[in-house]
Structures are given as structure tokens and as C-alpha cells.
Curated annotation (Swiss-Prot):
Gene Ontology MF annotations: ATP binding; ligase activity, forming carbon-nitrogen bonds; magnesium ion binding; ubiquitin-like protein transferase activity
Keyword Flavoprotein listed: no
One Pfam family linked to the record: Pup_ligase
Organism ancestry: Bacteria, Bacillati, Actinomycetota, Actinomycetes, Micromonosporales
Task performed by this protein: Catalyzes the covalent attachment of the prokaryotic ubiquitin-like protein modifier Pup to the proteasomal substrate proteins, thereby targeting them for proteasomal degradation. This tagging system is termed pupylation. The ligation reaction involves the side-chain carboxylate of the C-terminal glutamate of Pup and the side-chain amino group of a substrate lysine.
Binding site for ATP: R53, T66, W419
Protein name per UniProt: Pup--protein ligase
Reactions catalysed: ATP + [prokaryotic ubiquitin-like protein]-L-glutamate + [protein]-L-lysine = ADP + phosphate + N(6)-([prokaryotic ubiquitin-like protein]-gamma-L-glutamyl)-[protein]-L-lysine
Protein's pathway: Protein degradation; proteasomal Pup-dependent pathway; Protein modification; protein pupylation
Amino acid sequence: MERRIFGLETEYGVTCTYRGQRRLSPDEVARYLFRRVVSWGRSSNVFLRNGARLYLDVGSHPEYATPECDSVADLVAHDRAGERILEGLLVDAEKRLHDEGIAGEIYLFKNNTDSAGNSYGCHENYLVSRHGEFGRLADVLIPFLVTRQLICGAGKVLQTPRGAVYCLSQRAEHIWEGVSSATTRSRPIINTRDEPHADAERYRRLHVIVGDSNMNEVTTLLKVGAADIVLRMIESGVVMRDLTLENPIRAIREVSHDITGRRKVRLASGKEISALEIQQEYLAKATEFVERRGGDQTAKRVVELWGRVLSAVETGDLEPVAREIDWVTKLRLIERYQRKHDLPLSHPRVAQMDLAYHDLRRGRGLYGLLERRGQVDRAATDPEIFEAKETPPQTTRARLRGEFIRHAQEKRRDFTVDWVHLKLNDQAQRTVLCKDPFRAYDERVERLIASM
């Protein structure tokens, strides 16, 4: 299969609990968190030696954007590396707070909603050819993305006027459009703002903002891997039945509120079909496509897992995928906790548990606890994640950026970088423009590094 560039941008929730008198606003907490970054990067928006971008987003949300990866497996490791980097900042910030006599603990959550009903996202990026029909791509993808939460939602206890319900997705309640160029005001499923971060004549960046942030590496692998296969099918001209939804925004909420996958949603044709049936159609085509095209090991693992998740949902026996899929893992935890303490789903302690699942601090977060006990499956190893904290992917443009940053820092040279530019801030203001995200070696960059 042809290479594709992938990237994940994850916004994290941040809060602080206090034992003393002094209280900090979210802005102040975020500043403490980024103080170490600002001290060496002179900014709260920096690129790292591993090629990634780390910055404070609107509303004091720390955001980590992975470097460009050309395999889903690499992407999973770099996404987890982002968690470790932020966890390091958290430990540092807490120590500084305590040194200044502020008694409290900082929490970073890899989730998508806070208690005030605000939402922050996990944005997926897929490089696609400029020459395809972008409109058709979006049309075929939307029914897939609306129902994809069935296989990769993060799970959420939602308080409604009719009582608490367990939902598949955290993000579903906050999506208001199908396709749009805005990301915050209207929150579409697919964002169409045209910023390829590459040669604009050849490429376009498909920016999917409907997905949940996942704790489980296997769920992340499935989320991105399944979307990649569906994209490849569309690009290859695979004929798909028209599954256009009458109202994608209503459908995404209806799907989220039904963990059996059986609730019918209405198609534009007037026909009614369940989320499970829609996913089964995409899976059948994907399985045939991967077999015919001779997909790599990751693609084979993705369709196998996709099939197992849909079978588990169809039979109602979720146990076979409880170690791999976030919403199932969390549901099992909550159900056990409810039984043990005889609590209704609406109890505040259940909501607390829901949140604790996403706590990044490994000695404290629930997911981290499951991982340490070997109760969840993995798609990356600890050595791979450790390496991804420092080392960029070696087969994409991220390698050039990472090498440039490393050398400039070691030589104490002033520099500026973004996704496509590498610039030495000397008298000559030498800049190299790297428009090809697949290119990991470039003589111009080597010369720039050698000149330091």
C-alpha cells in the first residue's frame, strides 16, 4: 500500500486541586506547566527534538501535535510519547508549586469534556492527494465517522434530564456540523480549512475533528487504521452504497446514546439503518479491499480487530474486547464499581471514576493502573515510546526538523521552525523550505546543519 502521512493533535484538560489557601486559575496552572518549556524555548509554542509541536492552545489547553508519521504503528508510539512529555511537565510544575508554598496537585486529563461542558479535541490528520474529489471523500467518510464511535469511542457517563446514560463518545454531544472550515465555533466532523503543511499543488490535509482522545493504544490504532483503509477504498474508486445520513448531527448523538449499536438512524434516501449495520458494510468492503490489495500487518490487524469489536457489540458479549477498546474497558470498570458499592450511574463517585480513567499521572490515573497490572492490551512497547520522546520518525520530514533542532540547540544557535520552514536566525537569515512531508533526507538541510 502507498505511504500516507498521519498526525494526531491532542488537547489536554488541566485542573488543580488545593489543600491550602491560595488558588490558581486554569491560566496560571497552564503557565506553571509550561514554565520549563518557556525557559528554553522562549515561547509556549515550541517544536521539539522528536519533530513534534507542543503549545498552549486557546483556553489554557496544553496541546501536543505528533510529528509526521508514515505508519499507524509509529503514530501510536508518538501519541503516547506526547503523554509522557506532558506528564514530565506536570511533575515539574507540581514540584515548583510546592517549592513556592502552594499546596495542591495538578491534573492533566486526556479526555474531551470538562465539568463545565466545554469540549476540547483529538484531531486526526491524513494527507490526501489534491487531485481527488474532496467533496466525495467527505460524503463517503461522514457516515463512517458518525458510526465509528461504536468501535473506538472513549465512553462517557452523560447526565441528562432523564437521568444518567452511558455513551460511546465524549465528543458526539459537541459536534454541530458535517463539513466546515471552523474548528471551535461550529465543531464539524471534517474541517475543510485548506492548510496542507506541504506542497499545496499536490496535497491536501484531511482534518477529522470528530474523534475521541483514546487512552488505549489498540483503540487509537483501530481509530486511525480503519479511517485510513476507508480513505484508501474511496481513493481507489471502490464502489460504496450511498449511506448519506439525513441529519449527521442528530445521528451522531443517537449513535452515541446506544451502546448496543441497534438504534436506527435515517438515511437521506428515507431508509432506516443501524450504526452496527453501517459499520458492518464498511468492514465487509475493507476486509475484501485489504485481502485484494495485500495490506501490511497493521491493516490486517485493524480489520481483524474491527470485526471482533462489531461481533462483540452484535452479540452483546463485550468481554472479548474489554482489554482493547476504551469505551468497553471503562464500562466494565464502572459496572464493577457500581455493583461493589451499590451506586446508581448518576452518583458523583461514578463521574469521578469516569474522569480518573483519563488522568495522565501514571501512579494515579485509572487507565495507567490497568496498564501496569497488564489488564489492557498494547500496540506500542515502553522502549518505543521512550525513544519517540527524543527521536523523530526516521522516514518522514520530521527527521529533518528534529535533526535541525537538535544541532541548533547543541550549538546554541538561534533558530525558528514550523511544519515546513527551518530557519537560522543569523545575519544571512538562511531558510530551507521543506514542502515534501515524505522526504527524510535533504542536502539543503544537511548543508544548513553543517554550517552551524
